[in-house]
Amino acid sequence: MNELIKMVGIDYTEQRKKFPDFKAGDTINVHIKISEGKKERIQQFQGVVIQRRNPNTNGETFTVRKISEGIGVERIFPLLSPTIEKIELKQQGLVRRARLFYLQGKQGKAARIKAKITSKA
């Protein structure tokens, strides 16, 4: 029983370090391992981060939204999931909210997010 408590209490900072820092409004590309029968392949899911839930805990999740053939698709990923191969930060967004649920009712130009401009100095 004591060993189980130690395993649950493990801090996963090493596993967190392999992912970039991202927040709501950022455009990311998530590489996920998909196993179909005996085959295993990597599928990419690119979209805007709508929210991060339970930050800095072992149960942290993040929601990514994309538009596929005119239909909005949202997917929730656990940050410490073994199926996530890597996360690429494509673009940083400039937003004032931590949860961007207002994007669910918008399409096209109305759903755009301003890009954060970083200087290369």
Curated annotation (Swiss-Prot):
Keyword Ribonucleoprotein: yes
Biological processes annotated in GO: translation
Gene Ontology, cellular component aspect: cytosolic large ribosomal subunit
SUPFAM superfamilies referenced in this protein's UniProt entry, alphabetically: Translation proteins SH3-like domain (SSF50104)
Molecular function GO labels: structural constituent of ribosome
Keywords (A to Z) from UniProt: Ribonucleoprotein, Ribosomal protein
Protein family per UniProt: Belongs to the bacterial ribosomal protein bL19 family.
Reported function: This protein is located at the 30S-50S ribosomal subunit interface and may play a role in the structure and function of the aminoacyl-tRNA binding site.
Name of protein: Large ribosomal subunit protein bL19
Organism: Amoebophilus asiaticus (strain 5a2)
Gene: rplS
